[in-house]
């Protein structure tokens, strides 16, 4: 399940054809994630910008490089292989990411006047299709910046004030028997057999396989993989009126849990 650029998950739900209601394709169609109705992860991200060095201990892989505005090599991230951080002033920092020499993501992070929240206006082009996801991530401070560090240092937790473009929230799926097809505006897609073996995911370098397991007539359990390594699980349930999907997300890669909501369009 593709995560949009903020780290929150965009939901999908799948159905098993052996159940009469599901055989009618009640999940078929277009859905859209609702950030306001969702519950972001409680576990914060930890950033330190001090003595000319940027570090992120909660990033995967952990990051540490000079905050000099130049690009520095990053090993182990499927979405980018270079990153840069530039300090604009006492309350603003710019970040950028490249892959194979091409800029794939940019963000301008700004501290609020009270120092207790920050906003990150971002453009994400990490999908191989090049389709952009844009928006503004809004974070609340959980722990203060250490003495002598830039004011944007500290521990931060995402809030429901975050805004994301439809390209990062919308998804479509269609059921044919026990096969569920999934697609997004950014070009991510798969066709997976429910209760079958892992299927190939295309269009996302960090999400390469998916496995679906039916747990109840209107609930499906999904496991996502990067290669052969599980990176997340999603327990997706349909509301009684079939207009809302609620997903319990377990981000195994980052050790975070959250609850995501999507509505039928």
What would you call each of these model-derived segments?
Residues 1-8:
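Bacterial N-terminal signal peptides that target proteins for export
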Residues 9-17:
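Bacterial N-terminal signal peptides
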Residues 23-265:
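Hydrophobic small-molecule pocket/channel-lining residues, especially in calycin-type beta-barrels
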């Amino acid at each position: 399940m593709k995560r949009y650029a903020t780290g929150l998950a965009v939901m999908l739900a799948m159905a098993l054809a052996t159940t009469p209601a599901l055989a009618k394709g009640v999940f078929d169609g277009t859905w859209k994630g609702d950030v306001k109705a969702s519950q972001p992860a409680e576990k914060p991200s930890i950033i330190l910008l001090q003595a000319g060095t940027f570090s992120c201990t909660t990033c995967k892989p952990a990051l540490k490089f000079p905050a000099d505005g130049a690009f520095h090599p990053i090993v182990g991230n499927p979405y980018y292989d270079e990153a840069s951080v530039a300090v604009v002033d006492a309350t603003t920092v710019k970040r950028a990411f490249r892959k194979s020499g091409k800029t794939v993501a940019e963000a301008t992070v700004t501290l609020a006047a009270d120092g207790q929240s920050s906003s990150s206006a971002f453009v994400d082009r990490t999908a191989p299709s090049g389709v952009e996801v844009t928006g503004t991530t809004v974070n609340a401070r959980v722990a203060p910046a250490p003495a002598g560090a830039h004011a944007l240092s500290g521990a931060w937790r995402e809030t429901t004030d975050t805004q994301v473009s439809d390209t990062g929230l919308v998804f479509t799926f269609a059921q044919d028997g026990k096969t569920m097809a999934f697609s997004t505006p950014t070009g991510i897609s798969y066709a997976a057999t429910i209760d079958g073996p892992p299927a190939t995911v295309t269009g996302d370098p960090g999400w390469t396989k998916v496995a679906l397991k039916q747990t109840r007539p209107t609930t499906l359990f999904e496991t996502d993989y990067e290669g052969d390594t599980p990176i997340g699980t999603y327990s997706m349930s349909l509301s009684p009126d079939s207009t809302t999907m609620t997903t319990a997300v377990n981000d195994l890669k980052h050790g975070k849990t959250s609850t995501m909501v999507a509505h039928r369009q």
